[in-house]
């Protein structure tokens, strides 16, 4: 099914997965300069990752809807990635597979959709305006196209401010998983007005 045939997918309001663990603590100590060599080295290490995957809890909260789910994100190559949203029983509510020039999404009824742009597809199908193209960088702790950002005292991204398609996204990082090398985000919150997107990563596998 192509883009003009999109129907709204209503993910289950999975109240049992409220992200209490995703409350973002304040950062300790002064932030570091974006011009520091430590920050440049950290960015280089992250960008050199060929494959990675993470799973955890997802929440989308707005005046119109509240969605809670589990997520699985896997990148297998340049611009090739897979995103799953599942309910508490482990059933897939949404599966997205993207590669250059082609995006496929399967809903919880097995209906398949295709399009060129994953971000547009997610927005039209779910009603959630997730900045997926930028989130692919932000979830790694990289600023992407944003030039307004701050670092924490460990030379890692702590905040991003980015204007996109009339929206002013603010991204705040609540911590990093130091068990991985390089350290990867452990939880983060995106906000634009009354809209909030929360992600809590259980673990990372990087290569």
From Swiss-Prot:
- Outline what the protein does: Plays a critical role in the incorporation of lipoproteins in the outer membrane after they are released by the LolA protein.
Q: Which family does it belong to?
A: Belongs to the LolB family.
| Source species, domain of life | Bacteria
Q: Kindly list the GO CC terms recorded for this protein.
A: cell outer membrane
User: Residues of the signal sequence?
Assistant: 1-21
Keyword annotations for this protein?
Answer: Cell outer membrane, Chaperone, Lipoprotein, Membrane, Palmitate, Protein transport, Signal, Transport
Using the UniProt record, give the first listed, main subcellular location: membrane
Coiled-coil regions in this chain? none
Q: Where in the cell is it found?
A: Cell outer membrane
The protein's name is Outer-membrane lipoprotein LolB
S-diacylglycerol cysteine lipid sites: 22
UniProt record, GO biological process: lipoprotein localization to outer membrane; protein transport
Key word Metal-binding present: no
The organism of origin for this protein: Salmonella typhimurium (strain LT2 / SGSC1412 / ATCC 700720)
- Indicate where a lipid (N-palmitoyl cysteine) is covalently linked: 22
User: What does UniProt list as this organism's lineage?
Assistant: Bacteria, Pseudomonadati, Pseudomonadota, Gammaproteobacteria, Enterobacterales
Q: How does it assemble?
A: Monomer.
Q: Does the keyword Transport apply?
A: yes
Mind telling me which CDD domains this protein's record contains?
LolB
Look up and give the membrane topology term: Lipid-anchor
